[in-house]
Structure formats: C-alpha cells, structure tokens
C-alpha cells in the first residue's frame, strides 16, 4: 500500500494517484482517504458510493470515501492492506493532522507530491518527516505542473525524484505528455518498491 501524500492542498495528489495507477500493472486500487475534500470519484468519473468501481479511462479501480469515515478509515485501510490483490494507492488529505497521518502510518511506503514552488516543497518535506516519524519509508517524489528539477530537491525531501509532470490545459490525464511522465514515474516507483 502506497500513500500518495503532500502537505499542501491543490498540488496534484489526486491526479498523481490516478496517473500512477494508470501506469502500474494489474489494475491497481486507488482509495480516497480525503474525508474533508473527497474528489477522487469526480476526477475518475465514477459514482461516489462506498464500493470500488472500475475506471476504464485509467485502467484502475477506485474506492470513493465511505460516508462513515473517518472513524473507520484506519480499519478500512488496514483491511485493504492485508486483502489487496494488486497495488493499492491511497490519495491522502493535505496537512499534518490525524487524517493525514493515518494513511501514512498504515502504508508500506509514501510517494510525495508537490509543485516546484518553495512553500509546497517545504510542506512536502514536513509530510516526509511525518511519514518517517510513524516508521513509513518515503520512496520518492513527483513534482507536478513543471518540467524543472529544482536544485537539491532530493536532498530537501530526503528521497529520490521519481519524475516531473508538466502543466496541462484542461484535464491533465488527457494529455499524452502528462501520461508519459506518469508512466516514467511509475517505472521508477516499481524499481523503488522491489525492496518492500
């Protein structure tokens, strides 16, 4: 189970979760763990009920946020972690509260998502620290809405940069360049997860 996380809202965590899922084998499951602002179902184009839906556009399965969360969030994630038959990616909420820490604690690894701007990178570094504090390794980072690789970003975040994803007009995952970048990031992620 991989938590797709970043401290700042609006940096592309949900898009990255779907983009990576589309590029991974075995029709991964993407879980929306953002109880306050659940939008995975809308981006994936599936109903917002409490069961997994196949998302043909991204060749994955999507589990929207169940209405009875957050109390059952950790139970749901623990169950999925044990029972999953394919990669499971958890779209986490922004911030440093309990809602953000729960998926980090349960996951086997974390993928950070950030834009290249300094405040977002600082927040991503805080998320990395939070993951490490609960004993979860940070496997890498994806920078969104940029083709630039800021100097020392791997050192700041304490993990390798899996990829950079360009900005796109309209729906990012409809853009071929964006999909290709997520495919490259997913390949790097698979290399990083062979040790898990």
What annotation goes with each model-predicted range?
Residues 18, 22-26, 105, 126-129, ...:
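Short, well-ordered alpha-helices that flank and scaffold nucleotide-derived cofactor binding pockets
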Residues 81-85, 94-119, 124:
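Inter-motif core of Ras-like GTPase G domains
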Residues 134-196:
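C-terminal lobe/tail of nucleotide-utilizing enzymes
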């Amino acid at each position: 189970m991989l938590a797709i996380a970043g401290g700042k809202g609006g940096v592309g965590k949900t898009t990255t979760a779907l983009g990576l899922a589309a590029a991974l084998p075995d029709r991964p499951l993407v879980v929306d763990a953002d109880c306050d602002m659940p939008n995975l179902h809308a981006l994936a184009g599936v109903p917002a009920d409490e069961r997994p839906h196949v998302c043909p556009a991204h060749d994955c399965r999507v589990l929207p946020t169940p209405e009875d969360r957050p109390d059952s969030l950790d139970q749901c994630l623990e169950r999925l972690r044990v029972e999953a038959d394919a990669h499971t990616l958890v779209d986490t909420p922004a911030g440093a509260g309990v809602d953000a820490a729960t998926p980090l604690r349960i996951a086997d690894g974390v993928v950070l998502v950030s834009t290249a701007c300094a405040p977002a990178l600082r927040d991503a570094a805080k998320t990395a620290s939070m993951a490490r504090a609960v004993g979860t390794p940070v496997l890498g980072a994806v920078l969104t809405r940029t083709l630039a690789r800021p100097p020392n970003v791997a050192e700041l975040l304490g993990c390798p940069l899996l990829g950079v994803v360009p900005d796109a007009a309209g729906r990012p995952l409809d853009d071929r360049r964006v999909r290709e970048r997520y495919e490259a990031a997913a390949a790097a992620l698979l290399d990083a997860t062979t040790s898990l």
